[in-house]
């Protein structure tokens, strides 16, 4: 990875960044009962639909594709260059963080019980998912990607959203994320009901229960939450306000160090929601603080705080799983490792 972030976000103001998993903090895994499974739903989302889920379904089969690194590197480069060129977005935040949030929210609707929702079908493009209150603010990310899809109309929306997230992470000095193509756009009636994205106001029990639906274990959960090193929450989008730290446009293990080393006070924000703040103007969500309040999560937080390389390794594995949940990839669809713009001297 390049160590020169300035080439990508040349005029970023690191004090006014915004972002990623925002309203829906990532949560954790557990071997829960059916009642626990139901309780992980985001009942604070007023559009939550209590319709019953179908029986367990087989994995979606990805479209078979010839291994072609150059083909997708061109798409990666166009996304990365657009991020670089349009860096004025949101007070010079740039689009990187919100693209990661889009990839996560598209994948985060997956349900292991019946293989509905998730990263395969690109259903964010339909009104019901676009207008899910948990997706407030992601419309800007989707609009940003429209010219990319117009240039590459053969690219499915599921591939576009996931590839954009990978691109953003790598261009923000994060780890190299192996990515596979072959997701297939599905019809509107396959759009998951609102309410599948997480409620950031909850505790560790909720976190585990939520990520049980996504088949994640504790270590993967803590790794995924490390993406909160990026950007900030917005009151108008998520009901929470503030950045998680200082270096909000660089992918690091800062999130864990801030959890452990800062003094956090619980307040009620202007939206009436509880959040933690410190004297530097940073914040933590209740689901973030759950990681240091839980005796099983805490040792993992300490490990990642002390070893960024280990965090990158674990995050990479977990993020790949997130983007591939419920998908059966043919052998021909081999993982692609993209070069950053800096690595290509672009």
Curated annotation (Swiss-Prot):
Residues 177-199 are annotated as: Disordered. It comes from the Eukaryota. Transmembrane segments: none annotated. Heme b binds at residue 228. The record marks 101 as: Transition state stabilizer. GO terms for molecular function: cytochrome-c peroxidase activity; heme binding; metal ion binding. This is Cytochrome c peroxidase, mitochondrial. GO terms for cellular component: mitochondrial intermembrane space; mitochondrial matrix. Pfam families: peroxidase (PF00141). The active site is at residues 105, 244. Keywords: Heme, Iron, Metal-binding, Mitochondrion, Oxidoreductase, Peroxidase, Transit peptide. InterPro entries: Ccp1-like, Haem_peroxidase, Haem_peroxidase_sf, Peroxidase_I, Peroxidases_AS. Its EC number is 1.11.1.5. It catalyses: 2 Fe(II)-[cytochrome c] + H2O2 + 2 H(+) = 2 Fe(III)-[cytochrome c] + 2 H2O. Forms a one-to-one complex with cytochrome c. Its cofactor is heme b. Binds 1 heme b (iron(II)-protoporphyrin IX) group per subunit. It comes from Kluyveromyces lactis (strain ATCC 8585 / CBS 2359 / DSM 70799 / NBRC 1267 / NRRL Y-1140 / WM37). It is found in: Mitochondrion matrix; Mitochondrion intermembrane space. GO terms for biological process: cellular response to oxidative stress; hydrogen peroxide catabolic process; response to reactive oxygen species. The keyword Transit peptide applies. Belongs to the peroxidase family. Cytochrome c peroxidase subfamily.
């Amino acid at each position: 990875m390049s160590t020169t972030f300035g080439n990508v976000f040349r005029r970023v103001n690191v004090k006014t960044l915004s972002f990623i998993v925002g309203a829906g903090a990532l949560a954790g895994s557990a071997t829960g009962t059916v009642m626990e499974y139901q309780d992980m739903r985001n009942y604070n989302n007023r559009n939550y639909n209590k319709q019953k889920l179908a029986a367990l379904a087989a994995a979606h089969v990805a479209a078979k594709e010839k291994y072609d690194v150059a083909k997708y590197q061109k798409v990666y480069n166009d996304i990365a260059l657009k991020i670089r060129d349009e860096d004025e977005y949101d007070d010079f935040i740039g689009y990187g963080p919100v693209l990661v949030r889009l990839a996560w929210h598209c994948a985060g609707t997956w349900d292991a019980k019946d293989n509905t929702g998730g990263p395969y079908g690109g259903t964010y493009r339909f009104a019901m998912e676009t207008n899910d209150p948990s997706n407030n603010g992601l419309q800007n990310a989707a609009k940003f990607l429209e010219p990319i899809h117009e240039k590459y109309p053969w690219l499915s929306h599921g591939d576009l959203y996931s590839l954009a997230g990978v691109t953003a992470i790598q261009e923000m000095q994060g780890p190299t994320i192996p990515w596979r193509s072959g997701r297939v756009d599905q019809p509107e009636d396959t759009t998951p009901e609102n309410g599948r994205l997480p409620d950031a106001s909850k505790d560790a029990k909720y976190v585990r229960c939520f990520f049980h639906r996504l088949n994640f274990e504790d270590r993967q959960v803590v790794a995924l939450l490390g993406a909160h090193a990026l950007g900030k929450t917005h009151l108008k989008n998520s009901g929470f306000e503030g950045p998680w730290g200082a270096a909000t446009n660089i992918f690091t293990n800062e999130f864990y160090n801030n959890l452990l080393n800062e003094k956090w006070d619980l307040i009620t924000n202007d939206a009436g929601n509880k959040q933690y703040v410190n004297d530097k103007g940073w914040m933590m969500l209740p689901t973030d603080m759950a990681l240091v309040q839980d005796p099983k999560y805490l040792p993992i937080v300490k490990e990642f705080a002390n070893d960024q390389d280990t965090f990158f390794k674990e995050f990479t594995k977990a993020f790949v799983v997130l983007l591939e949940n419920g998908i059966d990839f043919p052998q021909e669809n081999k993982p692609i490792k993209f070069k950053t713009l800096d690595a290509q001297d672009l």
